[in-house]
């Protein structure tokens, strides 16, 4: 123990002052010891030295408390006492108080050291030294000096008991040296007519603790809480002792025979465990007023010491989330508040949260003069020129890992950092990514130009499935061609799984829409993997691209004669004079093609929000116009029930026993003034008040079928079944995420400086930073919560009627176009799908006939059974539906 004084790396000084009488024990509170957070095996080896003066001679008593385990035990006795009397270990206690605080308690009426005869009156306590060695081997020391020497006079304390004290059935509980009890009492006068004074005494096991009110009394008791401070004998705790007197009776309603009711709460400290569980709390109080003569009253309560572990013993911690790209990540630890450029003694430690081996997991420790510590794996660090300390971690894998970092300066001021490192998943998206300034990086694989519009809140998502690029809409891109996938940096929060991709400004038509689609004669294989999530909507852009399709998982009826392996429904080709027969009808379920299941999909999930898919799927090129409008649908969750319809359906459900999810939406109106041309096509939505309509025949959505992301494992952010989500007015340029309802708080992923592409979150919430913004438009949502159900209409569109959902929609083709206040560019007329319409009508009436026949059979069966039941003779009432007998 003598050598311990030489290895103290950090020392805390304190001055101890004893107040009033000696209660029979000395208590020294020791603050700011480092109990590391997120570490169940972080122990501390604690020793103490008690320095006495015996007739001018120094005497040391060394105590060994062993290893402290703050998560399992709160009270410790010395394992050994060196230089003390035989029973010295029974005279000391070390107790954890919570928040990194300790309390060392020693009996004062018994001597812990051996003395000679005649020295009994000459033993004084001078100081106390506590040595705290943490799991990193750092020695923390606390030196507590007595302001005045405290003489230990051994004596026998007689047993004290107060008579004429009313007993209560309330127990006073002591936790971490703090007593807390609430007692009912009565006073002869009401509030405002009474004063109040109180004192307490705790007796037991040769300990006598007295506490008195600091100001003597409350001169006037007021309605409500009357707070006061109290002072207890012995050591004054850094946590003040006090009490609260509260009137519980109405002002003019005394309790017969007792007076007015009050509630008294007392919280004295420190209360030593040396009292024992057989000790008693005595409360003496008085209340005198001008209208009644008062007197002294006494109530008593038993005291019990709790073995409950106190509130968190861990040091306060700052939490930071870091999402990084690549193989390593760096975190900079700033100087502590009391540190300057000349501080000579700085220590930085780091360990992974919840380690299981104290022999190998606590090797990462750096000082200003030390080099790279041995045994520190996956973590490296160095002091920078500005005194910050940069910690670099590597080889962490894909799962998030938590690193606990502490930094301590010369005066033992310590800050703790909890850093959660999360590696961004590998991206397969073709969308541009963000750099550290928030600008979209250009597409580097296809060489397509990126938009000149600078987004301020866009982040390329992590996607495990194929997507299609929308960086250039001047010419269709074969679906097998993907844009360069760059590392992405979304925070791995469940709120960030909405698909976001870069789309150019497409408010004007492209220059290549008059040329035939290169691959219009045959479906182009998009990818070799089926896309399970084919219900992602497209948002609000109004420019066409060449021969593209929108995923339509909600097929209206199965058709055996599918002429192409395309699993998605085709959009009508505009400007033709004859029906297009490329694909007669979409498959019932877009998640698994029923025809040509082994063939590659010709159109993968369209993840372009505000753009269009670039995969041509039309089987024959149109003559006059080569554009099939797919992106003016304004975030329609599911397609219409006919591949040639240009009018909104009047009925939201069909007879098809489809297992798809979103079967209640409809297509917006297209208008046309061009007789043959198809250039300058703009979709508009008719002005109409939207309401919610949910189909009763559509099954509940299966997991993963309405996701915005194309790969498995991405949480769904698309609209719910039966929902039409249409943007109002002109959509914002380069919108890359679904729209949120008005008033919904928008959570926006942000960009951090980690690796130039980190996206930080804190506590599972999004944080806003550089490159983030919040939409001010009432019907837009840049981000959103993927876990929040969105069942709404948030723009103008034709609504599905609330009539029967078992009828086929009425198809109209010759009605004049309905326009809105928006500027519209006409759309060329289309031919009527007579043969397709006729077959649908036949199927409709056939289905109705089958349903009618089934209904008649059920009615006949019910009548037959009822006739049979009435032919029997009952000796007791039959308990039929008409009457019940009791």
UniProtKB/Swiss-Prot annotation:
Covalent S-S links between cysteines: none
Comp. bias regions, Low complexity: 428-437, 507-595, 638-660, 684-699, 761-771
Localization per record: Virion membrane; Host membrane
Bias (Polar residues) ranges: 442-488, 596-637, 704-720, 733-760, 773-806
Biotech use: Primary surface antigen capable of inducing and reacting with virus-neutralizing antibodies. Almost all EBV candidate vaccines are based on gp350 proteins.
Intravirion domain ranges by topology: 861-886
Gene Ontology annotations for the cellular component aspect, listed alphabetically: host cell membrane; membrane; virion membrane
Region (Disordered): 423-810
InterPro entries from the UniProt entry: GP350_C_dom_herpes, GP350_C_dom_herpes_sf, GP350_N_A_dom_herpes, GP350_N_A_dom_herpes_sf, GP350_N_B_dom_herpes
Virion surface side of membrane: 1-839
Glycosylation, residue list: 47, 87, 114, 166, 169, 195, 229, 277, 318, 328, 345, 356, 378, 386, 411, 435, 443, 457, 497, 519, 533, 554, 568, 589, 603, 606, 624, 635, 662, 680, 714, 725, 734, 759, 794, 837
Assembly behavior: Interacts with host CR2.
Biological role: Initiates virion attachment to host B-lymphocyte cell, leading to virus entry. Acts by binding to host CR2 at the surface of B-lymphocytes, facilitating the binding of viral glycoprotein gp42 to HLA class II molecules. Attachment triggers virion-host membrane fusion and invasion of the host cell.
Family: Belongs to the Epstein-Barr GP350 family.
Official protein name in the record: Envelope glycoprotein GP350
Source organism of this protein record: Epstein-Barr virus (strain AG876) (HHV-4)
